[in-house]
UniProtKB/Swiss-Prot annotation:
The keyword Calcium does not apply. Its EC number is 3.1.-.-, 3.6.4.-. Keywords: ATP-binding, DNA-binding, Endonuclease, Hydrolase, Nuclease, Nucleotide-binding, RNA-binding, rRNA-binding. Residues 707-782 form the Smr domain. This is Endonuclease MutS2. Belongs to the DNA mismatch repair MutS family. MutS2 subfamily. PROSITE patterns: DNA_MISMATCH_REPAIR_2, SMR. It comes from Staphylococcus aureus (strain NCTC 8325 / PS 47). Gene3D superfamilies: 3.30.1370.110, P-loop containing nucleotide triphosphate hydrolases. Endonuclease that is involved in the suppression of homologous recombination and thus may have a key role in the control of bacterial genetic diversity. Acts as a ribosome collision sensor, splitting the ribosome into its 2 subunits. Detects stalled/collided 70S ribosomes which it binds and splits by an ATP-hydrolysis driven conformational change. Acts upstream of the ribosome quality control system (RQC), a ribosome-associated complex that mediates the extraction of incompletely synthesized nascent chains from stalled ribosomes and their subsequent degradation. Probably generates substrates for RQC. Signal peptide: none annotated. The keyword Hydrolase applies.
Length: 782
């Protein structure tokens, strides 16, 4: 966008306020570079960036960025062979520390805000490199001011020698200054330093009493700073040690600089990301100060700013107005009194668009909508008196000519007092002609004017809407309220009456104006009244909509909570049912053991009623509501003895042995016979006779040691296998042969997997060639 536009709209002041919120020179640099983008995707992304950080900033305490500085110059110097000093290394260390703290904060944030996504910040955190080793190397080698003594073995030895030598020098000099004989010869009984040498202050007249080197004298010349000869050699030794220390420090710093150079790319990424975060946090801080909101950007041309206000004005006193280009409206003409807020409205619209396209939240209520403009053109200036018409008019017209050269359908054009500064009739004609031209170009236009001719401009042109700033006749002052769709009317008669002008004069003046103009003023007055009524209703409607949305949100949350509660109850019921089934399964195992014992005790003579009594113990463990399937009354023909049925509550097949009455029947399920409700039975359709049918007899002599499952469907084969194994166990068989055939191998695999889980099977193997080979599985029973 043109710099002139940004200057007129005072965007630099906004940037200055954002800059005040930055912590580092990195963030400050990015604020100074901040400009409105014109690419739709870029504008949307910048706004998403700011809004995401603002959401986090408004809910959480962000880690401090204090001490973050620009270090790219140090990194580049390290890369070309320069040596960094301790201060520069500490700034690099602080960069790493800040990024690590932000990483930790983000990880905690993700854990706390479970389900909330921060995709942009997540991407930035993923960009941050791991620099733990470099941080530790710097941190363990130096503090804020100097290298640690133990930074190297050599440095520690040198500094130890310096310390011990200094101590000897001090002891020597202390004896001199504390000597009673020397008290009157010294200016002060202290040891001081001159030119990095330990000296004592001697009065000039006693110079001959002290052997040594004079290093300095006082301004008056009355005190000489003498290095006694007794410590000259020790001071020389200190100088040599200081030189050795400097060489060792240079070596250590060179080594650390090498580590920095090795991580140069990672450090530059860290600097870039943290600088961007400082910039975004500054935007978020400023946005909160103006209670900024996130606009929705539209591909088509849209401007809707609910209760917008100028961010540079005092928020406590400024009047917020809704600025809107309604559907199919391309031009808005604002009329009204001087100092009524027309110019502020233009600047508010222009500045908000510039802010939004720079990624700043805007000072409006929620729900604002904007399109992205390639450029914003302004002709806004202070009003001048008619005596300055030539300079004022020429200045405005020069600017307008420049605007008309460059404006297009992607532009927003703001005209303040269009056509002002010349003859009113010519100015009004020019204003209408200029507006026609800009509308033909396709630009979106908002213009302010004094000319009454422009009030009628919208009535014979499509896409043009009037607006006005309200004037309070009672207080004789503007209210600064913007009335969209209502042209401004003249208040001269009302103001004059309020100020005490004679009614005769006012009434005579009214007869001098045309009937049409009088009717227009009355129409405008009626429009103002209707606008206020509609605006009041709209505000009430907005309030009701918000209340409805809140109720909807509350109900949605309650419904979700109810669903979660219902789900938890179902899960709890399932868990209880599973526990019951587990207990029932164990009970079934006990029944089988009891049956074995009965068989051993009574041989093959196991009475039916004993078996049913044992099974009844299993039935008692099932609760119909918790583990039964959804039972529906059978829809087939009437069930009679001999029918094959499915027992719904157990999901098992059976055969009806006897109909006890209209409600109950005795059913044989495998080796178990039970009395069941008829409504719990579902009649099975007759199937073709299979080669092998289920074994129902329990005599050991009639149960074969082999089961032929060839021709069975997968599910039926497993049911048949279960029944057979139960009977084989009761017959005390140790080994049985399951014939499944070779085929595709699916039945073989299913049989063997089932045997692996069956509690009565201790082992199984494939058949030997003499036993049938791969078409047979041999199972060993427990």
């Amino acid at each position: 966008m043109r710099q002139k536009t940004l200057d007129v709209l005072e965007f630099e002041k906004i940037k200055s306020l954002v800059a005040n919120e930055t912590i580092s020179d990195l963030g400050l640099e990015k604020v100074n570079q901040m400009m409105p983008a014109t690419n739709f995707e870029t504008v949307v992304f910048q706004m998403e960036e700011t809004d995401e950080i603002a959401q986090i900033y408004n809910k959480h305490r962000l880690p401090s960025l204090s001490g973050l500085s620009k270090v790219s110059a140090f990194i580049h110097r390290a890369d070309i062979g320069g040596v960094l000093n301790v201060s520069e290394l500490n700034l690099i260390k602080r960069l790493i520390q800040v990024q690590n703290q932000f990483k930790t904060f983000y990880n905690q944030l993700v854990e706390e805000d479970e389900g909330v996504k921060y995709p942009i910040l997540d991407d930035k955190m993923n960009q941050l490199p791991v620099l733990t080793d470099l941080f530790q190397q710097i941190n363990e080698t130096c503090d804020t001011y100097d290298l640690y003594d133990n930074a190297s073995y050599e440095l520690q030895g040198i500094r130890s020698k310096i310390s011990s030598t200094n101590q000897r020098i001090r002891q020597n000099l202390d004896r001199i200054v504390k000597s009673q004989a020397n008290q009157k010869k010294l200016s002060d009984a202290i040891v001081t330093v001159r030119n990095e040498r330990n000296v004592i202050p001697v009065k000039a007249e006693y110079r001959q009493d002290f052997n040594g080197i004079v290093h300095d004298q006082s301004a008056s010349g009355q005190t000489l700073y003498i290095e006694p000869s007794s410590v000259v050699e020790m001071n020389n030794q200190i100088s040599r040690l200081r030189h050795d220390e400097a060489i060792e420090k240079e070596r250590i710093l060179t080594q650390l600089t090498g580590y920095v150079a090795a991580d140069k790319d990672a450090l530059l990424v860290a600097e870039q990301v943290m600088g961007q975060l400082d910039f975004l946090i500054a935007k978020a801080r400023y946005s909160r100060s103006i209670k900024g909101t996130k606009p929705i950007f539209k591909e088509d041309r849209t401007v809707y700013l609910p209760k917008a206000y100028h961010p540079l004005l005092n928020r406590e006193t400024v009047v917020a107005n809704t600025i809107e280009f309604m559907e199919d409206i391309e031009t808005v003409i604002i009329t009204g009194p001087n100092t009524g807020g027309k110019t502020v409205t233009l600047k508010t619209l222009g500045l908000i668009i510039v802010m939004a396209q720079s990624g700043l939240l805007i000072p409006t209520l929620d729900g604002s909508q904007l399109s992205v403009f390639k450029n914003v053109y302004c002709d806004i200036g202070d009003e001048q008196s008619i005596e300055q018409s030539l300079s004022t008019f020429s200045s405005h017209m020069t600017n307008i000519v420049e605007i008309l050269k460059h404006a297009d359908k992607h532009s927003l054009v703001l005209f303040d007092e269009l056509g002002a500064g010349t003859d009113p009739s010519e100015g009004a004609a020019l204003a209408m002609s200029i507006l026609d031209h800009v509308r033909k170009i396709g630009s979106l236009v908002m213009a302010t004017t004094h000319y009454p001719e422009l009030k009628a401009y919208s009535y014979n042109r499509e896409g043009v809407m009037n607006a006005s700033v309200e004037f309070d006749v009672d207080t004789l002052s503007p209210t600064y309220k913007l009335l969209m769709g209502v042209p401004g009317r003249s208040n001269a008669f009302d103001i004059s009456k309020k100020l005490g002008l004679s009614l005769n004069i006012i009434n005579k003046a009214k007869t001098m104006i045309g009937t049409d103009e009088k009717e227009i003023n009355e129409m405008i007055e009626s429009l103002e009244r209707n606008y206020k009524r509609v605006e009041t209703q709209r505000l009430e409607l907005d309030r009701l909509v918000k209340e409805a949305e809140q109720v909807h949100d509350d109900l949605s949350k309650q419904y979700q909570q109810f669903q979660n509660y219902e789900k938890s109850l179902i899960e709890e019921a399932k868990e209880k049912a599973n526990q019951k089934i587990k207990a029932a399964t164990k009970e079934a195992d006990d029944i089988i053991k009891d049956l074995r014992q009965l068989r051993e005790q009574k041989g093959a003579d196991v009475k039916e009623h004993e078996l049913i009594d044992k099974k009844k113990r299993l039935d008692d463990h099932y609760e119909a509501k918790s583990i039964k399937q959804n039972v529906q009354k059978q829809k087939y023909d009437k069930i009679v003895a001999g029918d094959e049925v499915k027992v719904l509550s157990y999901g098992q097949k059976g055969e009806v042995l006897e109909i006890v009455n209209d409600e109950e029947a005795i059913v044989q399920m495998g080796i178990i016979k039970m009395k069941l409700p008829i409504e719990d039975l579902e009649k099975k359709q007759k199937e073709k006779v299979k080669p092998t049918k289920m074994v129902t007899r329990q005599n050991r002599q009639t149960i074969k040691t082999e089961l032929d499952l060839r021709g069975y469907r997968y599910e039926d084969a497993l049911i048949e296998l279960d029944q057979y194994l139960d009977q084989a166990v009761l017959s005390n068989y140790e080994q049985v042969y399951i014939i499944h055939g070779k085929g595709t191998g699916a039945l073989q695999k299913g049989v063997q997997q089932h045997l692996k889980k069956h509690k009565s099977v201790s082992d199984f193997r494939g058949g030997m060639p003499s036993e049938g080979g791969f078409g047979v599985t041999v199972a060993t029973l427990k």
